[in-house]
Amino acid sequence: NYMAINTIVAMAPGLAQKVGLGLTEAGLVFSLWFYIRAFAFLKLWLWPGWHYRFGWFLTGLVGLLVSYLVLLTATNIPLLLLSQIGFGWCSALLYYSSLYYAMDGSQSHSEHGGIHEALIGVGICGGPALSSAAQWLTGSPMAPAWAVAGVLAAAVGWVCHLHHRAKSG
């Protein structure tokens, strides 16, 4: 989640230039996902129907991957806006799920809350580090997008594996 967020933040100026946005317009266009994320937090707080439903979490992971890729490859403003709706909603669902399950699903709330925060730190550091390494190694301006997308895809596979193992064992 935070790997994708920080990669988008780093690539936003180039993406804005690609679709012809000036600095002010870029700030407005690229802030949409923050507003969607805030709305999604409120919705998830008020509606408990998503609790302990694997499909919601998996949809958040897959949706984050898809919206991330669309956002980074968008060639027009409407597509940038549409992809941010998905990205904002999915990033909120994943963040809220992580925190909720860390705090609600165990007796050691503070320990699991600390693990949640540590994983955020890994994403904040790891996304830009992986992105920089990918661009340095390949020289391609899109290498950061594909490297982080690979990590997100691996996360989808890992979560599916864990879910399957938990159901069968």
State what each model feature region is.
Residues A10-A26, D104:
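Short amphipathic helix-loop junctions that connect adjacent transmembrane helices
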Residues F39-R53, Q135-W136:
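Helix-to-loop junctions at the C-terminal end of transmembrane segments
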Residues G55-V70, A149:
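Structural signature of the two symmetry-related core transmembrane helices
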Residues L72, W146-G169:
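Multi-pass alpha-helical transporter architecture, strongest
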Residues P78-G86:
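Paired small-residue
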Residues A92-Q107:
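Intracellular juxtamembrane helix-capping segments at the cytosolic ends
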Residues H109-L137:
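A late C-terminal transmembrane helix in Major Facilitator Superfamily
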Residues A133-L152:
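A membrane-interface helix-boundary motif in multi-pass transporters
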